């Protein structure tokens, strides 16, 4: 792996974590860091395959339209590179965290795509989130209900409004009742210091909270 900056963390949920940092790569290893030896070619191949599929659709366009050039965007549940590729084309800096119960380490290439098994609130354990001002939650896949609930719980929202002044949700699979509950939670913890915009386009329903 060459000489990389190495930092160690302890998580109540995940145990020992080691973050390796290179110029354009991050690797977050669970457990003994000596066992870490990722097959980079596998991930690079998979990322490029997903990128070619993504170019044929506008799935991420609705969310990308909510991001501005001066934003630094932290994305949760973004799939393998879809939204990061779209933002990269626009010159917008982003870091994407994929919540995955199978992959037990974090991997990024030049798109800063990441994979990590974690519960939602644990993201606030990592210092690098302070580099980002816009949080995007794109984890609302109906087959991933075990993941979704973390990001609409009060504990997560209470922390999120402390760290980010823009929070965007893909709420395509949320009911109107669920959407209203989400709005109420954000207003509660932002102490009404937020404006809300919603839009229906690109086969998505997107909601953005802007916290003053």
Where are these regions (language model features)?
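Detector for methionine-enriched segments
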Residues: 1-4, 30, 48, 85, ...
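N-terminal auxiliary segments of SAM/dcSAM-dependent transferases
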Residues: 1-37
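The AdoMet/dcAdoMet-binding core of the Class I SAM-like
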Residues: 9, 53-189, 193-207
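Segments forming oxygen-rich coordination pockets for charged ligands
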Residues: 31, 43-54
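A short, flexible beta-alpha/helix-coil linker loop
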Residues: 35, 45, 140-144
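Short, flexible, mixed-charge acidic loops at enzyme active sites
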Residues: 38-43, 132
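C-terminal lobe and adjacent flexible extensions of AdoMet/dcAdoMet transferase-like proteins
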Residues: 209-212
